[in-house]
Structures are given as C-alpha cells and as structure tokens.
C-alpha cells in the first residue's frame, strides 16, 4: 500500500497520547494530509549536534512514523541560518537589499539537502509518494533522483515565488531552477507565483510549455499549479464558540462596545508587515 512521505525542514512530532502539533501553516497542512494516508514525516529534529548521524531516529505515533536527523553547528549555520534565511527568504519576499549570498552558505545548503536525501532514500519504499515542503529543500528531488529514486515527488512552496528578475539576482538561481524541475508536481500559493516560475523556466531553462501547467525541460516533464493553503474553518469556528464561555473573553468583548478588535499572531519578521498593520 502506498504511503505518503512528507519531508520538511522541521518535523512536528506530537507527544505520546496524541497531543496536537504546532498550529503553523505547514504543520496544519501536513496533519490534514495524514488523515487520508498512513505515512512517514522526515526532517530535521531541531537538535544541533557536534557529531550528527545520517541514520534517522524513528518515532512511531499511530498511523504516522516520524524520522528525524540532527544538524551539525556548521550545517545549521550555512544551510538554515545562512542560505535559506539570509539569501532565499529575502529574495522570495522581494527584499533584495536584505539578502546576503555566500558561496560557503550555498555549499552548506546543498550539502544538507544531499545528506537528507541519503538518509531518506533508506526509508522510502517503491510505492511511496513523496511530498517535499518549502524553500529549505528546493534541490531535494534532484538529489533523490541522483540516488536512483523514481517515486512520484511533489513540492509545495509556502512563500511567494518572485518575478524572474528578482529570483535571478541570486547567483545560484540557475542551479536551483534546473534542480526544481526534478519534481513531478510543483505547488505554489497563487497564480501570479505560477506565472513567475513558468516564465523563468521558459526564458532561462528553455522549458517547453505543454498546456495545463505542464512544462518539458531537458526531456523531463513537470507540472506547476496553484494550490493556496486555507485554514481549518471548522476548527476556528469551534474555538470561537467555546471562547464565549470564557469570562475574560466576555469582559473584553463588553469593553469594546461598538469597536472591532483584530488580533494577529506573527513572528517579528519584516515579511509580516507588522509596523504597517
């Protein structure tokens, strides 16, 4: 029976007894996917270790098995803090002036993706469907293909995909574009993001449009579509209804009178527009 194999930078492992995972967008999306499939969730443990092993630690929680690996201090510095968050994150959010490219950071980013691929390949079964998440892992499919895996591999990009002139300001842009077409299906948040990536592949990688979001690049076919992530409407509705029973909530609402109160919960990051709000 086919399993769903999720790969992300971090893994949200529920506590024994089924306590819910974190409420971030990626964690919620993955949790919903596992309601329909048995599967495996692979990624970084969140631990920095001086001598990390490539053999993942396996943790079983009902229908889902979690597989995590540690990162070395150098890997964390170059792959995560470096290329992913000092180069890709600002570029993807159109903040070129805040981006910083380092060859050593990019080497670390590539190295960790290669390490992840080697560790994951040992766990993947022939019928598994692999679904990779977010900008930390753009080259992962290419690394897996290089190890001989021909499983269906999809990718979902949780943040914006910028216009070609912005993305191509990154010195490694060509390598990343060539790597991303090793995914069979690429999911983005908006139609504008889809157009940005498709045009870039056509203009710089000689991709041939086939219709329906499909492209042929160097003999390989990939499909790019918009799949915007929503929220758990039923869950939010239930939480709001339960909140009315809370005395503090009732007093707050009464104190507002005719005014409206909007509450946002965000990291203190320039991409969140906190000062503007």
Question: What are these regions, as identified by a protein language model?
Answer:
Residues 1-276:
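Catalytic cores of carbohydrate-active enzymes across secretory and cytosolic contexts
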């Amino acid at each position: 029976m086919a399993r769903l194999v999720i790969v992300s930078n971090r893994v949200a492992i529920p506590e024994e007894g089924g306590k819910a995972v974190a409420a971030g967008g990626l964690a919620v999306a993955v949790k919903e996917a596992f309601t329909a499939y048995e599967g495996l969730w692979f990624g970084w443990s969140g631990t920095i270790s001086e001598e990390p092993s490539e053999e993942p630690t396996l943790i079983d929680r009902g229908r889902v098995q979690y597989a995590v690996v540690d990162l070395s201090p150098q890997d964390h510095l170059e792959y995560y803090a470096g290329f992913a968050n000092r180069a890709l994150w600002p570029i993807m959010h159109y903040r070129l002036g805040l981006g910083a490219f380092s060859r050593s950071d990019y080497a670390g980013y590539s190295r960790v993706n290669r390490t992840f691929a080697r560790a994951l390949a040992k766990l993947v079964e022939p019928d598994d469907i692999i679904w990779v998440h977010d900008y930390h892992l753009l080259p992962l499919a290419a690394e897996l293909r290089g190890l001989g895996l021909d499983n269906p591999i999809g990718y979902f990009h949780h943040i914006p995909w910028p216009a070609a002139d912005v993305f191509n300001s990154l010195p490694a842009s060509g390598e990343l574009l060539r790597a991303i077409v090793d995914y069979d299906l690429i999911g983005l948040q908006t139609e504008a993001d889809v157009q940005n990536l498709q045009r870039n592949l056509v203009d710089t990688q000689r991709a041939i449009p086939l219709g329906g979001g499909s492209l042929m690049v160097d003999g390989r076919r990939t499909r790019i579509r918009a799949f915007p992530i929503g929220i758990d409407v039923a869950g939010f509705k239930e939480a709001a209804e339960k909140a009315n029973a809370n005395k503090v909530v009732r007093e707050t609402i009464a104190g507002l009178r005719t005014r409206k109160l909007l509450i946002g919960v965000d990291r203190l990051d320039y991409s969140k527009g906190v000062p503007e709000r």
